[in-house]
Each structure stands twice: as structure tokens, then as C-alpha cells.
């Protein structure tokens, strides 16, 4: 799914146009943000693509929504 990641005064957020929702990112697997999963305030886990650390925001990427079992396998 397409997701726009942006930085606001309160931190990072993700906008999902297909669902018309914007949620703050509350947890990041990798400090560089890219190539790992993020957790949104609504509980969604999104697997972000591997991009360069210096990628400027906002940016629209193709992310994958993962369920809890898949997230555990990804991080094991």
C-alpha cells in the first residue's frame, strides 16, 4: 500500500490515502527508519522499504502492512 511518511512538530506520521487516515508513528524498528517496521498509534505495523538514510521527508513509499505473527518472523 502507498504510504506518505512526513515529519511534523510532534514527530513522524504516516498517511495512508487508500484508507484516508493519518496516524503518528509510535515505534520505529531501525533508527534510520528505512528497511524495518514502524508501528502506528492505531496498532498497524508497516514494513518500510530499504531507502538511504538521508531520504528527505515527506516521501511516498510502497509499504507492506504486517500482522503480529509476520512481524515476529521479520525481527527474529
From Swiss-Prot:
Signal peptide: none annotated. InterPro entries: NifT, NifT/FixU_barrel-like_dom_sf. Transmembrane segments: none annotated. Pfam families: NifT. Keywords: Nitrogen fixation, Plasmid. GO terms for biological process: nitrogen fixation. To R.leguminosarum Sym plasmid FixU. Also to the N-terminal of R.meliloti MosB protein. This is Protein FixU homolog. It comes from Sinorhizobium fredii (strain NBRC 101917 / NGR234).
Amino acid at each position: 500500500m502507498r504510504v506518505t511518511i512526513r515529519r511534523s512538530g510532534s514527530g513522524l506520521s504516516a498517511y495512508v490515502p487508500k484508507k484516508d487516515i493519518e496516524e503518528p508513528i509510535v515505534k520505529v524498528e531501525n533508527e534510520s527508519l528505512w528497511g524495518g517496521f514502524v508501528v502506528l498509534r492505531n496498532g498497524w505495523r508497516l514494513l518500510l522499504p530499504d531507502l538511504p538514510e538521508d531520504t528527505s521527508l515527506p516521501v511516498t513509499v510502497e509499504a507492506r502492512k504486517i500482522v503480529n505473527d509476520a512481524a515476529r518472523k521479520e525481527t527474529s
